[in-house]
Each structure stands twice: as structure tokens, then as C-alpha cells.
Amino acid sequence: MAYIDPTLLILLVLAGLGIISHNMTVTLAILVLLAIRITPLNSYFPWVEKYGLSIGIVVLTIGVMAPIASGKITASEVMHSFLHWKSLLAILIGVAVSWLGGRGVSLMSNQPSVVAGLLVGTVMGVALFRGVPVGPLIAAGLLSLLIGKT
């Protein structure tokens, strides 16, 4: 009987979830990982694991900051954000979520046993509920509050 690679099977199932849910983000990410896995590029996985999250955060930050950089959101609009209660609340929530993300990075580094569950939950959330894959850091931060670890 032929050997079935369980990791490849998991990636295929996750890609299937992305396709079924019409979530191009998950589908493309999983397909790229599949391509890396089944080609000689698999020797680059340590690099992807080490720098992928940082590169992803940089790209996400560029996307979020682009409206300010392009002038679509003006300097006066940024300054006025400190005067409106909804904007002040958004700032406070942004600070809290960033803090949670920091705790999440720490927890994921110090307790790798939780990473698999966080990743599966995040991919399911992205695939099934049209979420975005920033979930592992925030989820890990929330988990760190619940289990009392940093």
C-alpha cells in the first residue's frame, strides 16, 4: 500500500475548505504551501517558518497604512480621530488588540503545543466564516489570558 503523507492530506482538506467557502485567501495560501511541500522548495520551510509571520505583518501593515500614505485619509482626519468618541474607542481597541497579539506571539513561542489548535481554529474561521488570518495571534493572546501564561 502506498504511503499517504498526513501533512499533505491536512493541507488538501484545508484547501478544500477554502474552495468550498469561496475564500481565496485560504485557498491561495494553502496551495502555495502545497507547492512548496511537494517540490524541492520544501528546503525553504525553515525560512518561511522563521520570517513568514513577520513578512505577513509587514504586508498587512502596508495595506492598512496605504490610505494614509496615499492621502485618501488626510492628516486632518487623523488628527480629528482624537476628538470623536468612536475614533477614541477604536484607538483603545487597537491598543488592546495589539497588546493581545504581543501576548499571543509570546505564548506561541513558549508553548508550541497550543499552536496546532490555534492554527486549525483560525483556518476554520477564515474558511467557514470569511474571517481573516490574523486570528492566531489574537487567539493566542486571549488564550494566554485564560490560562494565565505569557
Swiss-Prot record:
Main localization category: membrane
Keyword Transmembrane annotated: yes
Topology in the lipid bilayer: Multi-pass membrane protein
Subcellular location: Cell membrane
Ranges that cross the membrane: 1-21, 51-71, 82-102, 127-147
InterPro entries hit by this protein: UPF0756_TM
Membrane keyword on record: yes
Pfam short name (any one): DUF441
Domain of life the protein comes from: Bacteria
Entry GO CC: plasma membrane
Family: Belongs to the UPF0756 family.
Protein's recorded name: UPF0756 membrane protein ECA1265
UniProt source species: Pectobacterium atrosepticum (strain SCRI 1043 / ATCC BAA-672)
